[in-house]
């Protein structure tokens, strides 16, 4: 009797869906099922017709969009040419992760579940809809659903009786074995870095470009609550090209102080070199990690010790702990009944992995190095809208960065890893300051026809991609650029004020501003749109304008859509149903595009 084979495929934007997928993989191995865990876009989707048992774990991003690492799969699975019997041999389940404060809550999971049924798949259970807004987080829905799922799988796909389960509390074998080198290898610092300063091909996540920082300038006033930076990189000889609307991905590093503290708490020699040996055949090396590598480089450039740990972190840490009191507490925090306490201890105050390890020093000091890559996730790249055009700034790339800093009940303020790291970089210091980065196409696409007007609505740092678009269109001689820009105060966070005003004086730009804190009643961009309803309607309906929106995903898309609906009804004399259909047509024809973030 063969061991049943399970495939777990995930689409993850922030790491939560990947974490849940890895957790399912560990539970499968405990039950002695054969199991593979892969990102959807790294899996050869043509093989799906031969898979008997698949669990899909997928997040919903933005306004109902699939994560970046499942977009190719998403396009393929919705091909109209796929036969309705394509997946008739597959049993499947879909676990979704979303946020019920957004209109399209778990849209990706729901739509994928329906599509798999259309293609002949058999659903083991209704889809699980994890909700970030629940007081206990997604686990409130996931835990009971996963329990039912394993019951069903083990009945339908029984394991041979002579193969016992691995009990909880016993750690599974690590994915890799750390082989520490006795002699220091003769390699340079460049080879130890995850990125290159002289790429042969366009840079990518696996081979970023080390871009020198040219300028790092604060662009908010001294009294403004937030530090916002305009940062410029030199991309000479990088093979990087980009257009307005594209996105740059940046791979941050942990601070020297945190890296040193981590090595001390775990009793690691930061200067020790190592290579990795997979424990099982066919396991690929960790992506983007050079070998041989030093412990210092692993911790500073790869392990996300500044992230807030998930429940699975506590589960594995409890298995590894040899200290009775600490182990008992870790077991409690990782149990189903301990989720409220875990929320209060970790999620609510945004306590980091490093801080948790400091709270459990006996356990941390005895963690076998082999488990570091199982225990701690990889640092994830952060995406930024490119805020400049190569036509205006050749061989340069600019971004606008809001530095994340906030206070919780913990004594130390919370800092965003990437934004704080970028803000700390000083291009004036001795030697070049370099940042690993690469570029990908963004979600915004601008019209090439010279006489097509564009309406851009940008709130705060959401204006960044529109600066790139305006620079590009001006270089091509395209007029008809209408920018609705919203910020708090004219003298504190009016980004590129002088630049916009010069373009307006020359006839290249029509600028409409909304300063929300300069009067008693707050004024936002949606109010300015309503005030200029006749102009907006004439541009959209009379001149075929494209409409763009960028900013925070929580309220802005809904507020702006409601303003547009009002304009369509008042200026276009459309009924509510016709106005809704008009807005839908704009979206379908890419004449209404959004780039939003949570």
UniProtKB/Swiss-Prot annotation:
Major location category of this protein:
cytoplasm
- The residues that the entry says bind FAD are 350, 382-385, 416-419, 597
| Gene Ontology terms, MF aspect | electron transfer activity; FAD binding; FMN binding; NADPH binding; NADPH-hemoprotein reductase activity; NADPH-iron-sulfur [2Fe-2S] protein oxidoreductase activity; oxidoreductase activity, acting on NAD(P)H, heme protein as acceptor
Highest rank taxon of the organism? Eukaryota
Q: Which InterPro entries match?
A: CysJ-like_FAD-binding, FAD-bd_FR_type, Flavdoxin-like, Flavodoxin/NO_synth, Flavoprot_Pyr_Nucl_cyt_Rdtase, Flavoprotein-like_sf, FNR_nucleotide-bd, NADPH_Cyt_P450_Rdtase_alpha
Q: Which UniProt keywords apply?
A: Cytoplasm, FAD, Flavoprotein, FMN, NADP, Oxidoreductase
One of the Pfam families matching this protein, by short name: FAD_binding_1
Tell me how this protein assembles. Interacts with CIAPIN1; as part of the cytosolic iron-sulfur (Fe-S) protein assembly (CIA) machinery. Interacts with DCPS.
Name-wise, this protein is NADPH-dependent diflavin oxidoreductase 1
Organism this protein belongs to: Mus musculus
């Amino acid at each position: 009797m063969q061991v049943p084979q399970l495939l777990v495929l995930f689409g993850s934007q922030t790491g939560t869906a990947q974490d849940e997928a890895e957790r399912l993989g560990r539970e499968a191995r405990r039950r002695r099922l054969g199991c593979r865990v892969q990102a959807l876009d790294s899996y050869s989707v043509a093989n799906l017709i031969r898979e008997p048992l698949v669990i899909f774990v997928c997040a919903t991003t933005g306004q109902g969009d699939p994560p970046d690492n499942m977009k190719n799969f998403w396009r393929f699975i919705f091909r109209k040419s796929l036969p309705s019997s394509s997946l008739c041999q597959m049993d499947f389940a879909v676990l979704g992760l979303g946020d019920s404060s957004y209109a399209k809550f778990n849209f990706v999971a729901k739509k994928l579940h329906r599509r798999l049924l259309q293609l002949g798949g058999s659903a083991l259970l209704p889809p699980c809809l994890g909700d970030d807004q629940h007081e206990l987080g997604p686990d409130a829905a996931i835990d009971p659903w996963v329990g039912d799922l394993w019951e069903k799988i083990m009945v339908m796909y029984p394991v041979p009786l002579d193969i016992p389960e691995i009990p909880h509390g016993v750690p599974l074998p690590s994915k890799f074995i750390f082989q520490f080198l006795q002699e220091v290898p003769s390699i340079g610092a460049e080879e130890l870095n995850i990125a290159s300063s002289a790429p042969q091909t366009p840079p990518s996540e696996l081979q970023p470009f080390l871009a020198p920082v040219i300028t790092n300038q604060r662009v908010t006033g001294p009294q403004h609550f937030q530090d916002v930076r305009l940062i410029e990189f030199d991309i000479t000889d990088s093979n990087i090209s980009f257009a307005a609307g594209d996105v740059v991905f940046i791979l941050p590093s942990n601070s020297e102080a945190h890296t040193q503290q981590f090595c001390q708490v775990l009793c690691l020699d930061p200067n020790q070199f190592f290579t990795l040996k997979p424990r099982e055949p066919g396991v690929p090396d960790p992506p983007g990690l050079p070998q041989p590598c030093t412990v210092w480089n692993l911790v500073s450039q790869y392990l996300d010790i500044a992230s807030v740990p998930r429940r699975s972190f506590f589960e594995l840490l409890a298995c590894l702990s040899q200290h009775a009191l600490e182990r008992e507490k870790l077991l409690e925090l990782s149990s189903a009944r301990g989720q409220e306490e875990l929320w209060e201890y970790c999620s609510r105050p945004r306590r980091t992995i490093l801080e948790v390890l400091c709270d459990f020093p006996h356990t941390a000091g005895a963690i076998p190095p082999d488990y570091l890559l199982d225990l701690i996730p990889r640092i994830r790249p952060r995406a930024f809208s490119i805020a400049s055009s190569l036509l205006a700034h050749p061989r340069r790339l600019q971004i606008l960065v809001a530095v994340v800093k906030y206070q919780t009940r913990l004594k130390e303020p919370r800092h965003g890893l990437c934004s704080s790291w970028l803000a700390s970089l000083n291009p004036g210091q001795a030697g070049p300051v370099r940042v690993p980065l690469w570029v990908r196409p963004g979600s915004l696409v601008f019209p090439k026809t010279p006489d097509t007007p564009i309406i851009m609505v940008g709130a705060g740092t959401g204006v960044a991609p529109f600066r790139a678009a305006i620079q590009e269109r001006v270089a091509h001689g395209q007029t008809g650029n209408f920018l609705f820009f919203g910020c708090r105060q004219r003298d504190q966070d009016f980004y590129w004020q002088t630049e916009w005003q010069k373009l307006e004086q020359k006839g290249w730009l029509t600028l409409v501003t909304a300063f929300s804190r300069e009067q008693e009643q707050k004024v936002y961009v949606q109010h300015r749109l309503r005030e200029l309803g006749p102009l907006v309607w004439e541009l959209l309906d009379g001149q075929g304008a494209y409409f763009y929106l960028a900013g925070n995903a929580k309220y802005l898309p809904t507020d702006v859509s409601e303003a547009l609906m009002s304009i369509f009804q008042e200026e276009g004399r459309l009924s509510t149903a016709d106005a809704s259909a008009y807005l839908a047509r704009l979206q379908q024809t890419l004449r209404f595009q959004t780039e939003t973030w949570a």
